[in-house]
């Protein structure tokens, strides 16, 4: 445990941010998984709908600093390629 007052505060802040980031990342993984399941099933309409929602979540996570902007772009590109293969 830290003895310095500012470090005690940082520990609290970091823990809150860690939990928030964990929640966002979990939501992202779920969205990507549901998109991939729809794409694998060949359901193009549902996959298109999920692609828009997943892209939005990726952009929001990147803007909040949860994931890097390049990682969001790479994932969006991979999802777009997957939908084009259907």
Curated annotation (Swiss-Prot):
GO cellular component, one term: cytosol
Role of this protein: Binds directly to 16S ribosomal RNA.
Keyword Ribosomal protein carried by entry: yes
Keyword RNA-binding: yes
Family note: Belongs to the bacterial ribosomal protein bS20 family.
PANTHER family (UniProt xref): 30S RIBOSOMAL PROTEIN S20, SMALL RIBOSOMAL SUBUNIT PROTEIN BS20C
Keywords from the named record: Ribonucleoprotein, Ribosomal protein, RNA-binding, rRNA-binding
A biological process from GO: translation
One Pfam family recorded for the sequence: Ribosomal_S20p
The name this protein goes by in its record: Small ribosomal subunit protein bS20
NCBIfam families registered for this protein in UniProt: S20
A molecular function GO annotation: small ribosomal subunit rRNA binding
């Amino acid at each position: 445990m830290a003895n310095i007052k500012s470090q005690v505060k940082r520990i609290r802040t970091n823990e809150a941010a860690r939990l928030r980031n964990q929640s966002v990342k979990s939501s992202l993984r779920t969205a990507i998984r549901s998109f991939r399941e729809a794409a694998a099933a060949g359901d193009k309409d549902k996959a298109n709908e999920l692609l828009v929602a997943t892209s939005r979540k990726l952009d929001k996570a990147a803007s909040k600093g949860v994931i890097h902007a390049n990682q969001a772009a790479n994932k969006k590109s991979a999802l777009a390629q997957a939908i084009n293969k259907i």
